[in-house]
Amino acid sequence: MTQRTENLLGVLALLITDEMNAQPAVEALAGPTARAMLNAVGQYPDSSIEVLREAVDLSHPAAVRAVAGLVEAGLVEKRTGSDKRAVALALTVAGKREAKRLQTARDRMLQRVVGRLDDSEREVLESLLIKILWNETRDPAHAMQLCRLCDDGPCLKAGCPVECREQGLPMPERSHS
């Protein structure tokens, strides 16, 4: 039987997912897959479809379709890759603008949710999230999937639990900011 804590965590996960999916976007970004792929192209510029496919956990055909939609919408451009057989993908100016807008909306929503906690509650939540994420990260591909929508700047600076686990490093401490 599910305990109350697990139930509440599931509800919070749905709240965050539903709010992210409800963010208005251009038609090409109507679904979470396209949004995740757009963000992955921004996080891993000049990467191949294969690298990005892993980051968003898609089959190769699904990744090709997602990229084609982003290219058609003028959000992503194809370039010649370092390996002439592969295509490198990068955000266009419009793609960068959309990625930034979606990231800002995500940041605001998460700040609103966490902002209802006092400092000591935030510290406890951060410690618990570090422990959960460090323990749940399975491998490098899973790490890319987990962090596919992250603003990785603040997390990497403090010691990202997902990145630490993926690299075989010890679980990081809570940041003391």
Language-model features: locations:
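N-terminal helix-turn-helix DNA-binding core of bacterial DNA-binding proteins
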Residues: 20-62, 143
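Charged, amphipathic alpha-helical coiled-coil/dimerization segments
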Residues: 68-123
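Alpha-helical linker/hinge and terminal dimerization helices associated
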Residues: 16-23, 56, 98, 102-117, ...
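Hydrophobic/basic alpha-helical segments enriched in Actinobacteria
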Residues: 8-11, 15, 27-30, 42-48, ...
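N-terminal leader segment of winged-helix/HTH proteins
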Residues: 1-28, 175
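N-terminal positioning helix adjacent to the helix-turn-helix/winged-helix DNA-binding module
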Residues: 5, 12, 32-34, 94, ...
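C-terminal regulatory/oligomerization modules of transcriptional regulators
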Residues: 123, 127-177
